[in-house]
Amino acid sequence: MVETSTSLVKLEQDGSLFLPPGFRFHPTDAEVILSYLLQKFLNPSFTSLPIGEVDLNKCEPWDLPSKAKMGEKEWYFFSHKDMKYPTGMRTNRATKEGYWKATGKDREIFNLQPTSYGGSSNNKNNKQLVGMKKTLVFYMGRAPKGTKTNWVMHEFRLHANLHNDNPNLRLNLKDEWVVCKVFHKKGDDREAINKQQAQAAAVDQYSAGTPNNGSSVEAGDDDDDLFQLDSIIDPSIYFSNSSAANILSAPPNMSNSVVAANYGASTTTTGTASAGSFQQQPNYCSLINKSISSSNVSSWNNMPPPPPVAEGGVHGIGSSYSLQHQAAMVKALRDVIRLPNPLGMPQYKLDDAYLWDSS
């Protein structure tokens, strides 16, 4: 004898449904479509005791069990599909912490028609296609680099064939109700959560430690006036002869560097104590005096014009090209050729533009 509904089924004060031990809400796929989802389409105000209503885009999967009306391992919800774009047909499946990703093919749901003897038949002619079921898995993070979890959802939707038996049914893909069954497979999501937290921490650390690359020179760097000269100086600006300009393009400290005879540049021998070998380097002082004309040199640092040079030159260097400009050129090219004062030129004093340190 079946107990009365008042003693068998109780409605809790919070609206959840209470069933005695042993009773479960475990409908078939066809029952979900015909007994619940179809009724929601025919009457949007339809509610069901075992199926709640949520916005899946505003809830994380681990929060859904507390929002369900009933269920211990499986939870059912009505949900209104949210479109990703107002004019598109793609469904928005993202939440704050992750997203639902479809997996596999959609499965057809058939309703088995009753036979004359009261049972049901698997005969193809006795089956009616009533809905579709899509399987989705929740991923932590953002696509396409999300971390897979053990939260799974089955999404049930109506099939257009039901319109034949229900003339009042109106299907609109942009305004569609679905029933979602959410459950958690056996397993631990701590690995996925830890991986997601590690990725977030790595992004934060990278963002905090990345220097501002908007400028190659930081404010206040007094020694960076000539930064990366080998990449920003065009030697052809300062040499009237293109072949002479190519000298600056040669790798620094090359062994036995040879200067063409037509430049009249001699070579100086330098040695390295660690390697115990000697290298031939061009005498850039001779090269500058014989290959550079003052008309091809830019005025560096807007220096004042030099005083007249006496006939015969200054400091024994016979050239109309002033020592002041030569010293500025040497300083500029020192990082390029990577030689410490290779010309043996007197040091330029900053306090007086025309005084030289001859020591």
Curated annotation (Swiss-Prot):
SUPFAM superfamilies assigned to the protein according to its UniProt record, in alphabetical order: NAC domain
DNA-binding region: 130-191
Keywords: Activator, DNA-binding, Nucleus, Stress response, Transcription, Transcription regulation
Top-level lineage group: Eukaryota
Listed GO CC annotations: nucleus
A Pfam cross-reference name: NAM
Location in or out of the cell: Nucleus
Gene Ontology BP, a term: response to water deprivation
Transcription regulation as UniProt keyword: yes
Induction, per UniProt: Induced by salt and cold stresses. Induced by drought stress.
GO molecular function list: DNA binding
UniProt keyword annotation of Iron-sulfur present: no
InterPro entries documented for this protein: NAC-dom, NAC_dom_sf
Tissue-specificity statement: Expressed in roots. Expressed at low levels in leaves, stems and panicles.
Domain NAC span(s) in chain numbering: 19-185
General function of this protein: Transcription activator involved in responses to drought stress and salt stress. Transactivates the stress response genes LEA19 and PM19L.
Stated name of the protein: NAC domain-containing protein 45
Organism of origin: Oryza sativa subsp. japonica
